[in-house]
Amino acid sequence: MDLGLKGKSALVTGGSKGIGLAIAELFAAEGANVAICARNADEVGNVVKGLSAKGVKSWGRAVDVADPDALKGWIDGAAAELGGIDTIVCNVSALAVGDTAETWEKSFRTDMMHTVNSVAAALPYLEKSKSASIIIVSSVSGFEVDVAAGSYGAFKAALIHYAKGLSNQLIAKGIRVNAVSPGNTYFEGGIWQNIERGMPDLYKTAMSLNPTGRMGTPQEVAAGVVFLASPVASRISGTNLIVDGALTKAV
């Protein structure tokens, strides 16, 4: 299936590893020009080189997405480098699990406000696109209460609500908004690999809850994200796509 992304411009926050990297790579594989940001400049540079090797325009910058000015600067720079913005994927999470003032503040600034600020900065460019879309990466922890209850789950739930509200507000401008909620996703250097090594009992419990007998891959999440972002999904807005291999049970 041709997703109609060739020549489109896609921005991905947290695009240097894991789910964000898989999303950026799939956009590039579909012919889209891609801009990424992450905190590590060397990792950003390596990803940009890899994306450019696929024959598309690619650009990136080291950014702390909790800094609104730096985030806006990256978005403005990406629009200038790529010639506009057709889609933005708000993917970064602090992964701050816990119930302390510090974890609540970190989740608020990184998960919630990076998304709000990204949308605000990208809107002037999205309004000029003929196939504009916003994808907000949430989590099944925002859909069902689980071991990540607390700041992480609460703000992931808020992101789903925010995406739904935005979809209603922006559809008249031709901008679609959807959320994607991954279940347990395993990759090299990711949180589940760290849990597997440091807390094997917790990892074993999590694995036992997965009906497929395994965790998901970043590429499986990316497939849902890129499809929803594409013109092929032109009638889909306001949904929360759950990519969890039947992990959650809520209707």
Where are the regions a protein language model picked out?
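A glycine/serine/threonine-rich, flexible loop-to-helix segment
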Residues: 1, 49, 53, 172, ...
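Conserved glycine-rich cofactor-binding loop
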Residues: 9, 16-18
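Active-site helix of classical SDR
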Residues: 119, 155, 163
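Alpha-helical segment proximal to the catalytic Tyr-Lys
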Residues: 124, 168-169, 234
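Residue(s) in the substrate-gating loop at a strand-loop-helix junction
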Residues: 139
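Short C-terminal tail/terminal secondary-structure segment
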Residues: 144, 225-226, 237-251
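Short, small/polar-rich loop/turn modules that mediate ligand/substrate recognition or access, typified
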Residues: 171, 176, 236-238
